[in-house]
């Protein structure tokens, strides 16, 4: 009922539309030569004054929701399908970012950016294929906070506008961000 019904209705509609797209690609004979990528919006709404009392959506137990710097607000599912290029059923546990899409597509198309333009992201096709790890850090800034993901570590910089201490989490051991290791590992 209410927000939950709308939320799950949107998921059902999205599934139907993805099915229509795939059927059309197959009908046109270009399904096997088309990279399809799907990524959801960041975090479900709720527990934030900007969104009222709406609570639809789940974080899978991750801390935080939309507008939060914690994994429940920024970790989202992404799916990539490209027959013959990406192994079906493979799982990638490396963090990537939507601004990685542009350099990845440019690489696939063998396209050189004009004027040696530098892009923030990186080509993530080797990451998706399981051939390499991400090389660049992922920086974010939102609502007076900043955070940086490098490898399995995530640093949340609260000191920009707050007096709270900064936080560091090892997401490979603590994806739910329950143990701030900043005090015990300040060298990170």
Where are these regions (language model features)?
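The substrate-binding groove and active-site-proximal loops of carbohydrate-active enzymes
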Residues: 2-13
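Conserved catalytic motifs of the protein kinase core domain
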Residues: 33-35, 55, 75, 164-165
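Active-site-proximal N-terminal segment of extracellular/periplasmic enzymes that hydrolyze or transfer
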Residues: 179-186
């Amino acid at each position: 009922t209410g927000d939950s019904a709308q939320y799950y209705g949107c998921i059902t509609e999205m599934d139907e539309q993805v099915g229509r797209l795939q059927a059309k690609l197959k009908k046109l004979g270009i399904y096997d030569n088309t990279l399809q990528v799907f990524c959801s919006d960041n975090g479900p709404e709720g527990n934030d004054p900007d969104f009222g009392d709406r609570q639809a959506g789940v974080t899978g137990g991750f801390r935080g929701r939309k507008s939060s710097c914690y994994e429940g607000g920024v970790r989202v599912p992404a799916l990539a399908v490209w027959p013959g290029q990406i192994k079906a059923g493979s799982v990638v546990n490396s963090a990537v970012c939507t601004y990685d899409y542009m350099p990845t597509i440019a690489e696939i198309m063998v396209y050189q950016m004009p004027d040696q333009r530098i892009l923030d992201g990186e080509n993530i096709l080797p990451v998706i294929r399981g051939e390499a790890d991400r090389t660049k850090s992922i920086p974010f800034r939102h609502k007076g906070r900043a955070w940086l993901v490098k490898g399995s570590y995530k640093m949340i910089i609260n000191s920009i506008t707050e007096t709270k201490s900064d936080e560091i989490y090892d997401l490979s051991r603590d994806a739910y961000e329950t143990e701030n290791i900043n005090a015990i590992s300040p060298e990170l």
